[in-house]
A protein has these predicted regions:
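Extreme N-terminal segment that seeds HTH/winged-HTH DNA-binding domains in transcriptional regulators
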Residues: 1-54, 58-63, 68, 74-81
């Protein structure tokens, strides 16, 4: 990944991970990569990876099952126009 120096890394990784939830790469109910797997994929610290997972949960894009992991949340249906 090419890093933008003026944007915090957690925000850049969050943007990638949230896009994967929205575009269905991680379908609803699928377990997201662990903090360690995110560290390995993006070359970031575990603290940064945990921040990304926390932000995904706070945004409603993921939920945690204690002792199991973090999972992609079902996305709201788009209103019919």
């Amino acid at each position: 990944m090419k890093w933008e120096p003026e944007i915090p890394r957690w925000k850049q990784v969050y943007a990638v991970m949230s896009e994967r939830v929205v575009d269905g790469t991680y379908p609803p109910g699928e377990r997201l990569p662990s903090a360690m797997a995110i560290c390995d994929e993006f070359g970031i610290s575990q603290v940064t990876a945990k921040r990304v997972l926390t932000e995904l949960r706070q945004a409603g894009l993921a939920y945690m099952e204690p002792g199991i992991g973090t999972f992609a949340s079902p996305l709201p249906e788009a209103p019919n126009s």
